[in-house]
């Protein structure tokens, strides 16, 4: 896996996280493909900087990791089926093209890509953030027709009439109508009334990221974090396994320290103990002391 593919003048060039994000458009898409055209004051610059950093952080490398994992699994599957291994070539540009597949190709009659609104609240009136009473927020996610119907039925049961037809529209009138409904109660009320009934609506501002990973009941029930011991830092919580094949989480270790496995790797490729010790003494290889 590299940045620019196996051939051509860029094959040996390094590539870092922001490059494919910028070239493939994923970062700008997260911002609604909007950038200010006028000179900004300091508060506005801070807002746009925050948006840019958040849009970039979750894009190019995670997209590439998804494609690397999928490609490795496909290769292993092919090996298992055919008995033959094969070389798999992946690059960051291609990986991010896959992640932006809904807008990477252009053809006559192609439907436009769903775009975030100017305030970056969401993609559609039925898939966005809404402010509620007590300065709280919910995220509503009812993209399918059956989900819209369930949402409308639940509102009716709460004494709030809503025409299901408007939920299919993508306009400010629908946003305004739903905004007025959600402002009537706080986020805790809406989550309690809608989520247990199968309506995708949850409070969106309950925790900061750190508090979420440490204290959210859903995180704990899914074992999304796991305690471990780092040789330098001591006991800490790390993320749990992203994929499990059973009822329990595997035991996960901390990340390796710098050079931790250098001696093992050199031994695997034929270096004897004396040669490895000499490389360490010369400073050719180095390992971090715990």
PLM regions: where:
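Active-site-adjacent "lid/gating" segments in soluble enzymes
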Residues: 1-138, 142
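Flexible, small-/acidic-enriched active-site or ligand-binding loops
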Residues: 52, 161, 231-280
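A structural signal for well-ordered alpha-helical segments within the folded catalytic domains
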Residues: 63-70, 146-149, 188, 260-263
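Beta-rich nucleic-acid/ligand-interaction surfaces
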Residues: 96, 170, 209-216, 287
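Aromatic-enriched alpha-helical interface/lid elements that frame and gate functional surfaces
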Residues: 126-201
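A glycine-rich dinucleotide-binding beta-alpha-beta segment and adjacent secondary-structure elements
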Residues: 196-252
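Non-catalytic accessory regions
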Residues: 277-290
């Amino acid at each position: 896996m590299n940045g620019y593919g196996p051939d051509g003048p860029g094959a040996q060039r390094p590539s870092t996280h922001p490059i494919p994000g910028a070239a493939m458009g994923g970062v700008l898409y997260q911002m609604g493909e909007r950038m200010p055209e006028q000179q900004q004051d300091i508060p506005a610059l801070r807002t746009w900087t925050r948006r840019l950093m958040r849009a970039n952080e979750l894009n190019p490398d995670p997209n590439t990791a998804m494609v690397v994992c999928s490609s490795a699994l496909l290769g292993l599957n092919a090996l298992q089926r055919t008995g033959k291994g094969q070389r798999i070539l992946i690059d960051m540009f291609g990986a991010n093209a896959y992640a932006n597949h809904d807008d990477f190709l252009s053809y006559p009659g192609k439907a436009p890509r769903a775009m975030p609104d100017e305030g970056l609240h969401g993609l559609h009136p039925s898939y966005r953030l809404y402010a509620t009473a007590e300065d709280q927020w919910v995220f509503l996610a009812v993209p399918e027709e059956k989900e819209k119907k369930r949402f409308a039925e639940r509102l009716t049961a709460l004494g709030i009439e809503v025409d299901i037809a408007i939920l299919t529209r993508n306009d400010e009138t629908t946003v305004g109508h739903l905004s007025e409904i959600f402002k009537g109660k706080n986020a805790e009320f809406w989550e309690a009334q809608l989520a247990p009934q199968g309506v995708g609506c949850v409070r969106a501002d309950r925790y900061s990221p750190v508090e979420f990973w440490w204290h959210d009941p859903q995180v704990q029930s899914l074992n999304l974090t796991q305690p471990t011991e780092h040789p330098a830092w001591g006991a800490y919580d790390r993320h749990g396994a992203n994929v499990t094949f059973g009822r329990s989480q595997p035991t996960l270790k901390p990340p390796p320290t710098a050079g931790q496995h250098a001696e093992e790797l050199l031994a695997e490729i034929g270096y004897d103990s004396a040669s490895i010790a000499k490389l360490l003494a010369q400073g050719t290889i180095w390992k971090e002391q715990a």
